[in-house]
Structure formats: structure tokens, C-alpha cells
Amino acid sequence: MEWAKLVSELIQNHEPQRILDLKARKWYFSILAASYGAKVDVLDDIDNAEYPDYLKDHPNITYYKWKVENFEFKEKYDFIIAKHVVMYYKKEFILDKLMTDIYNHLNRNGICFITYHLPDSYTMTHNEWLFQYNLDDFKGLNWKFVLKDFWNYTNPVYWEINQEQHVEYVILVRQ
């Protein structure tokens, strides 16, 4: 599954006006969303040296240098992207605090796109300090969100021979 293709389809189908990209790192989705004309808030706690400074001055992108756990939601969004964010935090923080904040700052019928590595993924087996999530964790949020879609896929680790990343995504819609 190509993430960019999936996110492009979500943007085309739902036409979000305001998007939040949590822990954006390489800004792929931020740039993609801005190219569709959406206003994008980018949240990350590092300066991204891989992209030129002019991206931080893009007219549709606002950059916030914050840690996810310290970010104070102020805006309402149509689409929130959390690619490979949850595995860095305990379930209590993600499922109670962060998902409540997302719910409270996601417009009605807004979409939350979450990805995480599954336990047999190279990233998880080589980083024991990461936290494991599965689909059931997000199904338990049914009082807040409707589970619209989910999928998992495997792809090779480009820097390790005979190793695989096993990743799952969920798409939640605010009721």
C-alpha cells in the first residue's frame, strides 16, 4: 500500500480544508495535503533538516515545534494524520488523552488516519521500548469514532536484507 496514494484518495474524497499532521518528520503528507489547497498544521519536535527552510514558509503550512504530549489543540480539523506516532507512547496516553483531544478537535465526520507497526515488524522487534498496538485498541474507541477502514501490509526493510516491516493503518471517523 502506498501511503501517499491512500492519503491522496482520502483528501480527494473528503476535501478537508484544515489538516493536522502529528509528528510529521519528513513532511510527506503535509506537502501532499497543502498541494490540494488545504491549510495544514505540522507538528513535530525536531527541526527537519531533510527539507529546505522554504517549506516552513509555505503559505498553506504552519509549523509548530512541539512534542505531541505537550501540544495544546486549539483549532478544529477535518483530517488528522498520525503516521507512526502511537507506538512511541503508552496506551493510557494515546487511547485516553490523545484520542480524546483528537475527538474534541476533529469536526463532525472528520477523519483520523493512524498507522503503527505490528509486533512482528522489524521496527518493533529491534526497539523493545516501543509500545505495541493492534486493531482492537482502536475498535474500543467506538463511543467516539466509527472505524471506517483498516488494513495491514508487509514491505521489505530497505536497509536490512530479508527483514520486513509489518504495518497496520486505521481510519476513524468522528461521529
Regions found by a protein language model. Name each.
Residues H84-Y88:
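Short catalytic micro-motifs in class I SAM-dependent methyltransferases
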Residues M1-H14, K26-Y36, V40-P59, K65-E72, ...:
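Class I (Rossmann-like) S-adenosyl-L-methionine-dependent methyltransferase catalytic domain
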Residues I81:
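A conserved beta-strand element that flanks and buttresses the S-adenosyl-L-methionine
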Residues D96-R108:
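A short glycine-rich, Lys/Arg-flanked "PGG" loop and its adjoining helix->strand segment in the class I
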Residues K23:
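Conserved S-adenosyl-L-methionine
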